[in-house]
């Protein structure tokens, strides 16, 4: 098993490093397959009204989607260390396509929930791509490559939320999923052309059958316990993101505020800033070190979350803390991944499994909590929930400094 620090181009598997064009194509694929989970954000009130359900009931849609994603990643993502990422990514993309089609035509709320849950279970492709790319870039370019893929994810989230808001308001929420299914069909056909199969010179897959492969996550995590801390931090960060934006989807379309779903979508255009800033901030994290960078951005995030509660009465004032949240949010994920993607290539996918499972458990719980709290306490309750999550994230970020190699060397 060859460590990425061996100096062999592409992480030591004998392949040439990814070209800029190939990395951009991977980022595009990540954008499309990631977008599917975020269409619900601006149209959540429209879907709830159409099916005649309460905020806490509609909150089950994103919550179960995220929990199913965590289950799918735990059960399916470890296969990336054994089978071709190309084959797996294409198969799971086809699963997403099936889920989108059922959601588009569902006439029962619970059928819609079930299809959304299956969609989440199938959303594995964007989490295969970072480990795939990390084997094909030079170690000193890992932050930049991870940031490029994260930028693709951000672009997908942006298009999903802005586009879904406009389409849902003017054409109806079902057209959001008709369109998503059409684009997903295209990506399912294109993925085999974007990715390469497993190379003969690549490290041998881990021994054992499927159950032993899945369970092998646990001893690997015990060997690298920091991944649990990074995963918990990212779970909190992702939970804050979902709590804020699902709460906004209900708050801004409420009688008190009186805006439409398209306004919620337009507000999500703030994420455009990330397309320009995330690669540069990823390079900054390379220079600063992921753990120290994470402490800084966690404090900035806490400041932004506190402002949300005070400024919730005004759409225009909300823009200020939302801009700050969008600037720093992706860096929590990037710095978290950087703490373990420099480890040997043969264990990265399973470490990514633990990391992403924790991320989506946090996101799923926060999704339901945010809609439940909104139903009972309104926007200020949602903001207080986000503030509590952010305070815990700051504390864990400081604790994670004990894993910083620079500190260990001084000790």
Predicted regions mapped to residue ranges:
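Juxtamembrane intracellular "pre-TM" segments in multi-pass secondary transporters
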Residues: 8-17, 196-231
């Amino acid at each position: 098993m060859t460590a990425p620090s061996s100096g062999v181009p592409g992480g030591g598997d004998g392949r040439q490093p990814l070209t800029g064009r190939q990395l951009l194509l991977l980022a595009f694929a990540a954008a499309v397959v990631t977008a599917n989970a975020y269409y619900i954000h601006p149209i959540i009130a429209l879907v709830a009204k159409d099916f005649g359900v309460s905020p806490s009931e509609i909150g089950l849609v994103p919550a179960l989607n995220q929990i199913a994603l965590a289950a799918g990643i735990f059960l399916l993502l470890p296969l990336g260390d054994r089978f071709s990422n190309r084959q797996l990514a294409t198969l799971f993309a086809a699963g997403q396509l099936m889920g989108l089609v059922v959601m588009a035509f569902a006439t029962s709320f619970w059928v819609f929930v079930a299809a959304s849950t299956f969609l989440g279970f199938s959303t594995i492709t964007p989490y295969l791509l970072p480990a795939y790319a990390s084997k094909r870039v030079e170690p000193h370019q890992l932050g930049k490559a991870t940031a490029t893929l994260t930028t693709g994810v951000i672009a997908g989230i942006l298009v999903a939320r802005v586009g879904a808001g406009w389409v849902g308001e003017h054409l109806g929420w079902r057209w959001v999923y008709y369109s998503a299914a059409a684009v997903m069909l295209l990506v399912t056909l294109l993925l085999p052309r974007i990715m390469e199969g497993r190379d003969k010179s690549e490290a041998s897959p881990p021994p054992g059958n499927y159950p032993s492969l899945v369970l092998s996550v646990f001893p690997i995590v015990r060997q690298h316990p920091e991944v649990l801390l990074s995963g918990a931090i990212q779970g909190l960060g992702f939970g804050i993101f979902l709590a804020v934006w699902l709460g906004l989807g209900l708050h801004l379309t409420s009688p008190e505020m009186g805006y439409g779903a398209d306004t919620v979508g337009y507000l999500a255009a703030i994420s455009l800033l990330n397309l320009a800033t995330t690669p540069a901030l990823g390079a900054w994290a390379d220079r600063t070190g992921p753990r120290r960078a994470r402490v800084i951005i966690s404090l900035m995030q806490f400041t932004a979350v506190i402002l949300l509660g005070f400024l919730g009465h005004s759409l225009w004032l909300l823009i200020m803390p939302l801009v700050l949240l969008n600037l720093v949010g992706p860096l929590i994920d990037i710095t978290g991944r950087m703490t373990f993607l420099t480890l040997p290539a043969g264990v990265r996918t399973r470490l990514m499994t633990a990391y992403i499972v924790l991320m989506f458990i946090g996101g799923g719980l926060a999704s339901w909590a945010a809609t439940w709290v909104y139903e009972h306490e309104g926007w200020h309750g949602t903001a207080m929930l986000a503030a509590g999550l952010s305070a815990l994230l700051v504390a864990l970020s400081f604790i994670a400094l004990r894993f910083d190699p620079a500190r260990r060397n001084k000790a």
